[in-house]
Amino acid sequence: MTNLCPCGTGKSFGECCEPLVTGARAALTAEELMRSRYTAYTRAEIGYIHDTTHPDHRADFDEKGTREWAESSQWEGLEILATAGGGPADTEGRVEFIARYRDTGGRRTHHELAEFRKVDDAWYFTDGYGIKPQPAVSTKIGRNDPCTCGSGKKYKKCCGA
């Protein structure tokens, strides 16, 4: 049985993110770097997370906080929602993603729009912006509206009674 890569591609770790996290090769795209950074979090490879942060932004890197978050979380999955740019021929890219994890407070999601820049053929993370969930929009059911259960009765005479 193969050890699947935590980044969610369905490939084995050895043929997916391991060569990037170990430094055997560089990421070819911003999305590939994003996936490998997520994998590094799941394995608490803080050195890789630091090294793939753009040099201009490393002064803001909190190694202790990053290590605590990585080690205290049970990583449950990565979902890439959208990418813009970030291809092999690009110099900038954005990746919107959701990382799911569990900590002492329960299940959590980290929804972010991450920005990447390529310098000398190497992709780097430059910044990330948290995306807040949109409030659920629901319509109020009127008492004289048809019941949502599909009975054909008015709501007030069915489930609203």
Curated annotation (Swiss-Prot):
Domain of life: Bacteria
Organism: Geobacter sulfurreducens (strain ATCC 51573 / DSM 12127 / PCA)
Family matches, as Gene3D superfamilies: 3.10.450.50
Listed name of the protein: UPF0225 protein GSU1048
Family membership: Belongs to the UPF0225 family.
Alphabetical list of InterPro entries matching this protein: NTF2-like_dom_sf (IPR032710), SEC_C_motif (IPR004027), UPF0225 (IPR023006), YchJ-like_M (IPR048469)
